[in-house]
Amino acid sequence: MSDFLSELWLVIKKRIEEKPQGSYTAEIVKRGLPFAARKFGEESVELIVASLSEPRDSVIYEAADVIYHLMVLLALRGVDWAEVIKELERRSRAKSGAGGNS
């Protein structure tokens, strides 16, 4: 399941580095970190709204937007996707059998 997310991460990183003409990711980079953060916030709100009142396919669509914009934001902040996965794994190990937060 996470193989595609790893591939997407690599594509996002490449587009950030190369900034190809016509790339949406490159456009976000050009507009800067505050823009990327706002886009992530907007997409998060859209997911919340969809979760509460829209059909299932809308929730899936908005969730994909949130994941993409999260990855772009992380990349712009210099946080590697593998670090986030590692943190989730750490939490899972720390909480296994203890009730946890997940």
From Swiss-Prot:
Q: Which UniProt keywords apply?
A: Amino-acid biosynthesis, ATP-binding, Cytoplasm, Histidine biosynthesis, Hydrolase, Nucleotide-binding
InterPro entries assigned to the protein according to its UniProt record, in alphabetical order: HisE, PRib-ATP_PPHydrolase-like
The keyword Ribosomal protein appears for this protein = no
So which residues are the signal peptide here?
none
Q: Does the keyword Lipid biosynthesis apply?
A: no
**Reaction catalysed?**
1-(5-phospho-beta-D-ribosyl)-ATP + H2O = 1-(5-phospho-beta-D-ribosyl)-5'-AMP + diphosphate + H(+)
Could you state one GO cellular component term attached to this entry? cytoplasm
Question: What's the EC number here?
Answer: 3.6.1.31
- Primary localization class, coarse: cytoplasm
Pfam families referenced in this protein's UniProt entry, alphabetically: PRA-PH
Family recorded in the similarity comment: Belongs to the PRA-PH family.
Q: What is this protein called?
A: Phosphoribosyl-ATP pyrophosphatase
Record the organism: Ignicoccus hospitalis (strain KIN4/I / DSM 18386 / JCM 14125)
Q: Which gene encodes it?
A: hisE
